[in-house]
């Protein structure tokens, strides 16, 4: 399967993207038009005021960072009342959907609502929706959810676990 300039490869019924294909897929979505950033710049723009935030997401090999998008900012006007997900990063052809948020028991419902919004939003987003992807909740101030709590079990059912940091490529 080929795009206009880039290539899409099927892997376990999910597509992986090259750098051009990711950028084209992003620019092809009306509310994301103009939101593509090289490397982790979409996250870095948001983290400028918070030095600790910058170290939350790192890449094993920065040459494999195909770009990033601040989904929250790009979709704010179209979905002002929605609980929007924060970012997507394309690393070595796979999409990492990242939510930077305090990881407290009281925040679980809010983050699950954001995940539900994201999955619903992706349904009609062609290439982004079909790509190989994973979802990550990165704790902005440590993880404060008891492992055996009801909230931890709710997260496990949805396949989401708060992490202190994300190392792409591990």
Regions inferred by a protein language model and the residue ranges of each:
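Acidic-basic catalytic patches of nuclease active cores, encompassing PD-(D/E)XK
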Residues: 2-79
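Domain-level recognition of nuclease-like catalytic cores that cleave nucleotide substrates
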Residues: 5-6, 11, 15, 19-29, ...
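Short amphipathic alpha-helical segments, especially helix-boundary/capping motifs
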Residues: 60-62, 92-96, 128
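A glycine-rich, hydrophobic loop/mini-helix early in the fold
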Residues: 73-92
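Short acidic, S/G/P-rich loop/turn micro-motifs used as interaction or catalytic elements
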Residues: 76, 103-107, 143-146
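Conserved catalytic cores of phosphodiester-cleaving nucleases, focusing on short active-site segments
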Residues: 87-89, 93-104
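Mg2+/Mn2+-dependent nuclease catalytic core
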Residues: 104-117, 121
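Arginine/glycine-rich "motif VI" loop of SF2 helicases in the C-terminal RecA-like domain
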Residues: 120-131
């Amino acid at each position: 399967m080929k795009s206009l300039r880039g290539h899409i490869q099927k892997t376990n019924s999910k597509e992986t993207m090259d750098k051009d294909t990711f950028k084209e897929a992003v620019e092809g979505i009306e509310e994301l038009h103009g939101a593509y950033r090289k490397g982790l710049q979409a996250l870095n723009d948001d983290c400028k005021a918070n030095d600790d935030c910058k170290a939350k997401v790192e890449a094993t090999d920065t040459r494999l960072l195909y770009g990033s998008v601040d989904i929250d900012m790009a979709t704010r006007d179209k979905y002002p009342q929605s609980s929007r997900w924060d970012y997507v990063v394309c690393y070595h052809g796979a999409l990492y959907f990242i939510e930077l948020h305090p990881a407290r028991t009281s925040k679980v419902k809010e983050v699950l609502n954001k995940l539900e919004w994201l999955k619903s939003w992706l349904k009609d987003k062609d290439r982004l929706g079909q790509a190989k992807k994973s979802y990550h909740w990165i704790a902005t101030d440590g993880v404060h959810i008891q492992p055996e709590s009801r909230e931890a079990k709710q997260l496990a059912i949805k396949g989401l676990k708060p992490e202190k940091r994300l190392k792409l490529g591990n």
